[in-house]
Regions:
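Early exported N-terminus immediately downstream of N-terminal targeting peptides
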Residues: 108-162
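A cross-family detector of function-defining hotspots
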Residues: 136, 148-159, 165-168, 173-179, ...
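Surface-exposed, short loops/turns at beta-strand junctions within beta-sandwich domains
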Residues: 72-78
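A short tyrosine-centered beta-strand micro-motif
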Residues: 78-85
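Aromatic sugar-binding surface patches on proteins
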Residues: 26, 33-69
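Short beta-strand elements
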Residues: 12-22, 79, 90-121
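Contiguous beta-strand segments within globular domains
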Residues: 1-12
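Long, intrinsically disordered, low-complexity segments
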Residues: 237-249
Length: 268
């Protein structure tokens, strides 16, 4: 909504839609090094790299208040900013809104590719890349089913594990979505593998997820640090796990629980 208070002076409204380069990768393993400060996964969005998708100019020749609506069809997945500029006397007025576009049925998983992608937390790298390279959707869905049933031999148990896994993926999308899908975030990965924490300890810059009453056990307490950027339009939380090489065996054991089906009785 824009107001022109000048009777004999038209007001110009300039707008543009930007698309930014942003991180789309899934969370890296718990035992790997932390992200480097200059990396895109650390920053989330690179505001220095963008594409101008649309720009327009509107001139209000008459005084009064008008509402201007903008429609952008078929925006692809990614992160955008809509900017509006106008001049009021000697002052430039600038407003902006950052937003993210995901799949039409997000946070649900509907397509074989969407079902296959989160299996990256359970599969070997080469195997998952081979799965994601399958172009035929029917064959890809069969490969997803084959992965589960080849590990969990009991069909009934396999169906229960599959249901639990994708319930957590969808819940991760609901709770931890930011500039990318929630399941791809560090918190999303931890939620999928370990489930909801027993307790959450919040401070201004970090969250601690606790999965036991022993607050000193590194295998049941995980710290996420929030990385803030000097950009008032950055609308996303960006909590990243403080990784540790000691998590290697813990992560391995947790993956084996999923692959064996014992996750149903022993979460952590």
């Amino acid at each position: 909504q824009v107001t022109n208070n000048k009777i004999n002076e038209p007001q110009t409204i300039d707008t543009q839609l930007l698309k930014f380069d942003s991180d789309t990768l899934h969370a890296r393993p718990m035992s790997w090094p932390d992200y480097t400060l200059a990396s895109l996964p650390y920053k989330g969005i690179d505001y220095g790299e963008f594409e101008v998708l649309n720009n327009s100019k509107r001139i209000l020749s008459q005084p009064g208040t008008v509402t201007i609506e903008f429609f952008f069809d078929d925006l692809k997945r990614g992160n955008y900013r809509f900017e509006v500029r106008t001049q009021v006397g000697d002052e430039e007025i600038y407003k902006a809104r950052d937003f993210s576009v995901k799949s039409p049925h997000y946070p649900s998983l509907r397509t074989p590719r969407e079902l296959a992608a989160p299996l990256v937390y359970l599969m070997r790298k080469d195997d998952h890349e081979e799965l994601m390279a399958i172009s035929d959707l029917k064959h890809q869905k069969l490969a997803v089913d084959r992965f589960w049933l080849s590990n969990i031999k009991n069909t009934t148990k396999a169906l229960q594990v599959i249901e639990l896994y994708y319930e957590r993926v969808e819940e991760a999308n609901k709770q931890f979505s930011n500039y990318k899908e929630g399941w791809k975030t560090d918190m999303g990965m931890m939620y999928i593998l370990f489930g909801p924490p027993w307790y959450i300890e919040n401070t201004l810059e970090q969250k601690i997820w606790r999965y036991s009453n022993d607050f000193y056990n590194p295998e049941t307490n995980f710290t996420f640090k929030s990385y803030k950027f000097k950009n008032k339009f950055y609308p996303f939380d960006n909590f990243q796990l403080l990784r540790n090489q000691q998590y290697f065996s813990l992560e391995y054991r947790q993956i084996q629980k999923w692959l064996s089906g014992s996750i149903l009785r022993d979460n952590i």
